[in-house]
Amino acid sequence: SIRRQRQMCIRDSCNDDGIDILDIEIPEGYALSAGTSTIFLNSSVAYDTPADWITGAYDVRFTRGDRLYDDVRTSNNGHGGGLGPVYAGYSCGSCHRNAGRTKPSLWTEGGSGSYGFSSMLVYISRKNGAFFQDYGRVLHDQAIYGVQPEGKLSVEYTYETFSFPDGEAYTLCKPNYTISEWYAEEIKPEDLFCTVRIPLRHVGMGQMMALDPVEIEALAAKSNYPEYGISGRCNYITERGVRSLGLSGNKAQHADLTVELGFSSDMGVTNSRYPEEICEGQIQVNQGSMMGLSYDQLDVSTEEMENVDLYMQSLGVPARRNVNDPQVIKGEQNFYKAKCHLCHVTTLHTKTRGSVLLNNTQLPWLGGQTIHPYSDYLLHDMGSEIMGVGLNDNYISGLARGNEWRTTPLWGIGLQEKVNGPVSYTHLTLPTNREV
């Protein structure tokens, strides 16, 4: 496969088809972002390349999982099908391009539903936090041919320019979302809480799943710096009947990589954990049936989902680059001076046994590693707004309140534009560059 060729080229110090490969000696310390899972790429596939320990049968499974992650699902019954009848994305890669992020498509499409595609996830609820009976927790603004989407998402952006103390300008864009063309009950704006999020990068997923909960809980115990107005806490959720430490998601609202949930909620693809259509009981199931589709079988197998889980957990993490560059060193000094490290913790450790897949297959290669994700994976109160733009989305996730957000890991962020082009750096599309 092309990925294996890329890895071979790294080892042999060659170059294939102009792919940009860093020809450097393996450094020590912080440059090794993820221990033995660190990779040395500076290209558009820097997030989408396996760690070196993926070989043999695992390489075969990785490739299968990669294909399932990227391939466009169809509405047909059978292998590769099951999309819809309503959905939010047509594949994992449609929102997580190259295992990264996507530019909010509403910038150019003008709206979602029958009018365009949205790569953003729209959470909706009543003002009291309850879900709408006819819609659930997520607005599915896409639908297969002949089926009505749940609603249309539109947006208007307001731009405002500010300046740093040295005079350098930066821009914040404030989104104003509206939902129209509801398929059932029309929800009035005054009755609706709506939070729209851009997909997260899938960098370091395996390392995150291998983290030692004791270390994270210890960080929460000491993460209280009243002199800086900083404190952090864990999110705990109940999944599969077990109370667990939340690690993944904008609000650390999940204890795993949500592969099964992603297939179901995002794509409408039924599976062993979520065997019912996401719009079960809604008119869209009948509309799909009238198009000749059957909804009496699972759309994706557990084995296929396990391969996607393996793919995500075994992706390599890009090394820190240019660590001896004077400007980089100065930036690192400013990082500590500004106390960024109090939340974006530089160094963590993985459990000795590593992580496990959905079928409890052990991944020992992820165990006993010193990693540098630049995150504490804790919830922090981000306040109600920044420069007049609301940060409190009033959406409760586990123990996380509306103004609390998980510290985003920073590893690989310097390659984001190379991987995904000009995209936002927060869940709300606020800043248009990293400096903010």
Where are these regions (language model features)?
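Bacterial Sec-dependent N-terminal signal peptides
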Residues: 4-7, 11-34
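Short glycine/threonine-rich turn/loop motifs
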Residues: 25-56, 60-238, 317-425
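Extracellular low-complexity, Gly/Ser/Thr-rich intrinsically disordered linkers
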Residues: 277-317, 327-333, 406-428, 434
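Ser/Thr-centered flexible coil motifs
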Residues: 55, 256, 301-302
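Active-site substrate-binding loop specific to GH73 endo-beta-N-acetylglucosaminidase modules
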Residues: 231-291
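Single conserved hydrophobic/aromatic residue that forms the stacking wall/gate
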Residues: 1-6, 10-12, 427-436
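Extended, non-globular alpha-helical segments
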Residues: 18-19, 29-30, 109-111, 292-300
